[in-house]
Regions:
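Catalytic-site neighborhood detector that most strongly recognizes the C-terminal catalytic loop/helix
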Residues: 19, 76-80, 109, 156, ...
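C-terminal catalytic core of tyrosine-transesterase DNA break-rejoin enzymes
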Residues: 43, 47, 53-54, 118, ...
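Basic, Lys/Arg- and aromatic-enriched nucleic-acid-binding interface segment
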Residues: 2-52, 56, 78, 185
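Catalytic tyrosine of NAD(P)H-dependent dehydrogenase/reductases that use a Tyr as the general acid/base
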Residues: 131-132
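Short, polar N-cap/turn motifs at the start of nucleic acid-interacting alpha helices
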Residues: 62-69, 126, 147-166, 177
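C-terminal secondary-structure termini that scaffold catalytic or DNA-interacting sites
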Residues: 182-188
Length: 188
């Protein structure tokens, strides 16, 4: 078997990266979830970009004062890469009362998926939202509000900037849609 040249390898189709807008995040914050810990964990991920596996493993000793504010210092389960994520006031507001051991005590993933789907529906959001969409939400919100692509990439723990550029493309598409909201007035 011979190795394929990079140019010969079939390209994977870009997946649809569903995310929440800021208004949708606010709507979820105002809507009862049915499980307060699932609600807090999901919103915490919307404000930190942490994957579900990292949220499930997050312990209180990983949340520390850096001298410039609170941050999560953790090793990503998926990649083994160390990440340092400063915590905004929005993220801090989602933390449960400080204790020992794990920060978020969550149900099994299947149950959590059902809770999340029902919560999103109750909030009147018609998108197909999974837990991982919280990570997409974080990246998209940061870029929408002017964050540097390289900083977002570092916060997400991406090893390749092209992974983060997918979110920049989403933001660019939203800019086009927004500009097109002004109807053509027909006069030149």
């Amino acid at each position: 078997i011979t190795k394929m040249e990079i140019s010969e390898k079939p390209k994977r189709p870009e997946s649809n990266r569903e995310y929440l807008t800021l208004d949708e995040v606010k709507r979820l914050m105002r809507t009862s979830c049915g499980n307060e810990m699932v609600k807090r964990a999901f919103l915490f991920s919307c404000f930190t970009g942490l994957r579900l596996s990292d949220i499930e493993a997050l312990t209180w000793d990983r949340i520390r004062d850096s001298g410039k504010g609170m941050q999560v210092e953790s090793t990503q389960i998926k990649t083994g890469k160390a990440v340092y994520v400063p915590l905004s006031s929005n993220a801090l507001a989602q933390l449960p009362e400080r204790g020992r051991g794990r920060v978020f005590h969550l149900p099994v993933r299947y149950t959590m998926g059902e809770i999340l789907a029902n919560w999103v529906k109750r909030a009147g959001i018609t998108k197909h939202i999974t837990y991982h969409c919280s990570r997409h939400t974080y990246a998209t919100l940061l870029l929408t509000f002017g964050a540097n692509l390289y900083t977002v990439s570092a916060l997400l723990g991406h090893t390749d900037i092209s992974t983060t550029q997918i979110y920049a493309k989403i933001v660019d598409e939203n800019k086009r849609k927004t500009v097109d909201l002004i109807p053509d007035i027909g006069e030149r």
